[in-house]
A protein has these predicted regions:
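Charged catalytic carboxylate motif
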Residues: 6, 59, 142-145
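C-terminal boundary of histidine-terminating zinc-finger modules
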Residues: 123-145
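Generic serine detector
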Residues: 2, 28, 42, 98, ...
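Residue-level recognition of oxygen-bearing side chains
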Residues: 6, 119, 138
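Short glycine-rich substrate-engagement loop in P-loop NTPases that contacts/grips substrate
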Residues: 1-7
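Residue-level signal for the nucleotide or nucleotide-sugar donor/cofactor binding architecture
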Residues: 2, 55, 138
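Conserved catalytic-core segment of NTP-binding enzymes
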Residues: 9-118
Length: 145
């Protein structure tokens, strides 16, 4: 067993009990992310509406391609989701435009944009989902879309 397949082997026993298994990874390309990509059927790529996360998309796409070639040929990219976006700012609008221009022909860019809101950080700090913490807020409504 290779270390990149550890999570896939563990989840194989659980798959029969669930319709979906969500694997939420930190924004890094370490071993946990590689394991998640190797185990996943598909991936939704969240991208913060900032310059550096947008630049990181290039490396992530290369990593996903490598995982598809070497570990998980069935891995699909379901789409890219813009997060932490304050669409009143030029930066957020430019980030969205760049995503659509550079990746939109090959990868679905979701129309839904997750807005920046303090309630998202507060819900994490409280150990609650955004639906438990602020079910009628803008972030919860955006994720529900």
């Amino acid at each position: 067993m290779s270390r990149e397949q550890t999570l896939k082997l563990y989840l194989a026993d659980l798959k029969k009990d669930y319709d979906y298994i969500l694997i939420d990874c930190m924004p890094s390309l370490g071993m946990l992310t590689i394991n998640a990509l190797a185990a996943a059927d598909s991936v939704i790529v969240p991208v913060q509406a900032h310059y550096l996360p947008l630049k990181g998309m290039t490396q992530l796409m290369k990593t996903i391609g490598k995982v598809q070639r070497q570990l998980n040929p069935n891995l699909k990219i379901d789409g890219v989701l813009l997060t932490l976006a304050d669409m009143r700012t030029k930066l957020a609008k430019t980030t969205e435009d760049s995503l659509r221009e550079n990746y939109g022909k090959h990868i679905r860019i979701f129309k839904t944009v997750i807005p920046v809101a303090i309630t998202a950080a507060e819900s994490s700090a409280a150990g609650q989902s955004i639906y438990e913490y602020d079910k009628n807020g803008t972030v919860a409504k955006a994720y529900a879309e």
